[in-house]
Amino acid sequence: MRRVIIIGSGQIGSRHLQALKAVPLPLSITVIDASPESLKTAQERYESMPVGKFEHKMDYITEILKNSEPIDLAIIATCSDARARVTTELLESAKVKYLILEKILFNKRSDYEAIGKLLVKTKTKTWVNIPLRVMPTYTKAREYFKDQRISYIVTGSKIGLATNAIHYFDHVAFITGSTDYEINTSGLDPHPIKAKRKGFLEFTGTLTARFKNGSNVSLTSYPNGNSPIITEISSSNAKYIGRESEGKAWLAKADSNWQWQEIEATIPPQSKITTLLTESILNKGTCNLVEYKESKKIHLQMLEPLRSFLNKNSKKKYSSYPFT
């Protein structure tokens, strides 16, 4: 029986938990959260899912156990301000073979290097859950645009740029193979807004980036309205338009005389994605999420300029990243 631990049973953590119910391997699952209310909600969500191939062993506890048995897979789904501390505590308490971290990874620059060294020391293979690259429609985009210079445009209302820009920068890195980029914050609205999660901030306006291979990214979050998220990717050889809310996308390619064709673009929920990720990791020792070292680089190239922009436009000066 494989041991799986989830730390943080809030919105995203409980979705990871739901996904584990369908994993076709016998699991011993421990859910850890300081809030008994969150644990109760997570348990209810887990029990609401269809019965899987195996009835997994379940435990719900409020703290990390010291000197526990080796863990096959841990998923840390806390907020960014607690994740480095929790990761350190876990790795000092048990041998963890595989680890999935949520984004935004951490809220302090120093944590990125410190946790990276700890992961090497403990030989813990680690990925970051930025799942566009494992969603079928976005995975296939790599076939259309691989190693090309692309234009990548996303628009929509209330996207939450601090939270979600990392998804798109990671996807561009996945498509193009280029991980070096610079962002331009001049199009952001100067005053940040409160994020959905208490104590964190968000940006509206337009955030742009230029990758080393010449690819350009433009992400626009309208502060009002209900404009759906539309993703447009184009190169000299292909054009892609995706409407996530409808599960639809259209593709035109030069070798098809630029004729538009509708393609399937269903976006699977986290409660299904994690099922496949867990099965792949436990059976093969790998998955298609971005690995920690690469994601650390992609994170910091975004977070440092955002912090500088925030300090330039705020009376309060931030030494950390108030994003999650």
Residue map of PLM features:
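Short acidic low-complexity segments
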Residues: 53-70
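Beta-strand-loop-alpha-helix segment that lines the small-molecule cofactor/substrate pocket
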Residues: 72-80, 84-133
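C-terminal helix-rich "cap/oligomerization" subdomain common to oxidoreductases
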Residues: 26, 45-46, 73-76, 279-324
